[in-house]
């Protein structure tokens, strides 16, 4: 028996039919760098790199630029002839636009005869007596009578049209006042010289403007160079730029030459002064800068005149006079003239801020003495009646004994060779009286001793009674006792 095999094909029921994907065009096979442009049909490169394939039906565009003389690098299809000219798509488009513009220019506009023929159909005919042929002949006759020449006119192109000055209409108002021989073409010698002078002045101003422009460009490039050098200096460090250890031998030599060239271009001494004067004269000669320089110079000089000669001193800030002639300015309030003396007047200006009545240093009045010494007090009467035995003799006043340290500030030390001034803390003006009393006692010791001998025993009783009264002035006097011996107190 023959066996029948039945193959059951799987069904697509319940399955999603996949959408066929459109085949993406392959990218260019340029090897030097990845190119994402699609390939040309049947080729391995895009239109930009198709010249890499020597077998491709393309060659370089035949267009050559008139500015720099370079040939277009784009690809163009090979012509049928071997030496034929072929252009790329861009230059084909440009040639088509240029040809279209040229055809527009060469194609003349509608002629006058054609326009009249087109308008003749709108003309009114009298009772239909005129025919189109008669109207055509009438239009031709009018054109023939009004034509400029008997011959046939050629179409007028753009190059044949009159090119006038666009500002001629604006200048037509003043045309009556102008010279009627302005366009005659014949000039006198004076007119030629005047015209040439105006042209030279104009040319000079143009050259000056160009020079200023070049100066501006130089300053701008120098500023950029200094800025870049500063950034590089901050990034790399000073040792790599100026230090000899961070430079090569050739770089050191170049740096040395640059420094020598910089010193060579500098001017010194008289040459520098002459160069500055030359720059000032050039500034005065230029238009615009002359007025500014003149204004700056005149504002810096004093306006006063001495013997019909202007003062050459520099004026003070915000004023027009120098320090010597500032009082001539009636509006200023900062200076006054010195009053001087009755014999010799003085007009030297002095600032008001120093005093209400300012004076120059020659006539300045010194202020009164602020320090006044104190007056010596008179000797009171109750001290004269004191006991005589309380005073010291001349022998006792001799400095035979060493004084304590509290009196050392008031004495002269012979051994040290220097003098110590009295201490201001020990100064007491009330002790001047006691100082005079001690001096009087030291100068006249004999009288004191005589009075003591003449006094009897009876006087001693009286002196003992008065001793209690004299205790008070004794405490104020310049005498003190220490260890039973009288010692003088500190006297300043």
Curated annotation (Swiss-Prot):
It holds the Pfam family zf-C3Hc3H. One of its GO terms (biological process) is chromatin organization. The modification Phosphothreonine is found at residue 131. InterPro entries: NSL2 (IPR026316), Potential_DNA-bd (IPR025927). There is a cross-link at residue 78 (Glycyl lysine isopeptide (Lys-Gly) (interchain with G-Cter in SUMO2)). Residues 127-182, 455-492 are annotated as: Disordered. GO terms for cellular component: histone acetyltransferase complex; mitochondrion; NSL complex; nucleus. Residues 135-144 have a biased composition (Basic and acidic residues). Its main location: nucleus. Keywords: Chromatin regulator, Isopeptide bond, Mitochondrion, Nucleus, Phosphoprotein, Ubl conjugation. The keyword Magnesium does not apply. The keyword Ubl conjugation applies. Residues 167-178 have a biased composition (Acidic residues). It is found in: Nucleus; Mitochondrion. Residues 308-364 are annotated as: Required for interaction with other NSL complex members. The modification Phosphoserine is found at residues 147, 149, 168, 172, 175. Non-catalytic component of the NSL histone acetyltransferase complex, a multiprotein complex that mediates histone H4 acetylation at 'Lys-5'- and 'Lys-8' (H4K5ac and H4K8ac) at transcription start sites and promotes transcription initiation. Required for NSL complex stability and for transcription of intraciliary transport genes in both ciliated and non-ciliated cells by regulating histone H4 acetylation at 'Lys-5'- and 'Lys-12' (H4K5ac and H4K12ac). This is necessary for cilium assembly in ciliated cells and for organization of the microtubule cytoskeleton in non-ciliated cells. Component of the NSL complex at least composed of KAT8/MOF, KANSL1, KANSL2, KANSL3, MCRS1, PHF20, OGT1/OGT, WDR5 and HCFC1. This is KAT8 regulatory NSL complex subunit 2.
């Amino acid at each position: 028996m023959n066996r029948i095999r039945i193959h059951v094909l799987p069904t697509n029921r319940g399955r999603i039919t996949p959408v066929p994907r459109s085949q993406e065009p392959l990218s260019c096979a340029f090897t030097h760098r990845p190119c994402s442009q699609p390939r040309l049909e049947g080729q391995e490169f895009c239109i930009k790199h198709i010249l890499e394939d020597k077998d491709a039906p393309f060659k370089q565009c035949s267009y050559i630029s008139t500015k720099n003389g370079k040939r277009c690098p784009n690809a163009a299809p090979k012509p049928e002839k071997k030496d034929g000219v072929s252009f790329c798509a861009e230059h084909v488009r440009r040639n088509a636009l240029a040809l279209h513009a040229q055809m527009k220019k060469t194609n003349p506009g509608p002629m006058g005869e054609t326009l009249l023929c087109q308008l003749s159909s709108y003309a009114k005919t009298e009772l239909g007596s005129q025919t189109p042929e008669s109207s055509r002949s009438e239009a031709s006759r009018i054109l023939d009578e009004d034509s400029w020449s008997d011959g046939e006119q050629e179409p007028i192109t753009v190059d044949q049209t009159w090119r006038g000055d666009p500002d001629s209409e604006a200048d037509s108002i003043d045309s009556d006042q102008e010279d009627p021989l302005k366009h005659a073409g014949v000039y006198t010698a004076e007119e030629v010289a005047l015209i040439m002078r105006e042209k030279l002045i104009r040319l000079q101003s143009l050259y000056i403007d160009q020079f200023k422009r070049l100066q501006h460009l130089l300053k701008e490039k120098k500023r950029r160079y200094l800025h870049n050098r500063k950034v590089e200096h901050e990034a790399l460090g000073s040792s790599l730029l100026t230090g000899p250890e961070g430079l090569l031998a050739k770089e050191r030599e170049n740096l040395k030459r640059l420094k020598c060239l910089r010193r060579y271009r500098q001017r010194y001494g008289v040459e520098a002064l002459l160069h500055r004067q030359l720059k000032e004269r050039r500034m005065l000669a230029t238009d615009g800068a002359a007025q500014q320089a003149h204004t700056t110079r005149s504002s810096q000089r004093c306006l006063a005149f001495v013997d019909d000669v202007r003062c050459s001193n520099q004026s003070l800030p915000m004023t027009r006079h120098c320090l010597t002639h500032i009082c001539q300015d009636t509006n200023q309030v900062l200076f006054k003239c010195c009053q001087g003396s009755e014999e010799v007047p003085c007009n030297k200006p002095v600032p008001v801020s120093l005093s209400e009545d300012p004076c120059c240093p020659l006539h300045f009045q010194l202020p009164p003495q602020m320090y006044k010494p104190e007056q010596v007090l008179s000797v009171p009467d109750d001290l004269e009646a004191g006991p005589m035995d309380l005073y010291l003799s001349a022998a006792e006043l001799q400095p035979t004994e060493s004084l304590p340290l509290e009196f050392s500030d008031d004495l002269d030390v012979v051994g040290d060779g220097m003098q110590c001034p009295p201490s201001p803390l020990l100064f007491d003006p009330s002790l001047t009286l006691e100082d005079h009393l001690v001096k009087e006692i030291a100068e006249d010791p004999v009288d004191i001793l005589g009075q003591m001998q003449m006094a009897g025993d009876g006087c001693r009783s009286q002196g003992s009674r008065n001793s209690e009264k004299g205790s008070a002035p004794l405490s104020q006097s310049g005498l003190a006792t220490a260890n039973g011996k009288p010692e003088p107190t500190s006297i300043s």
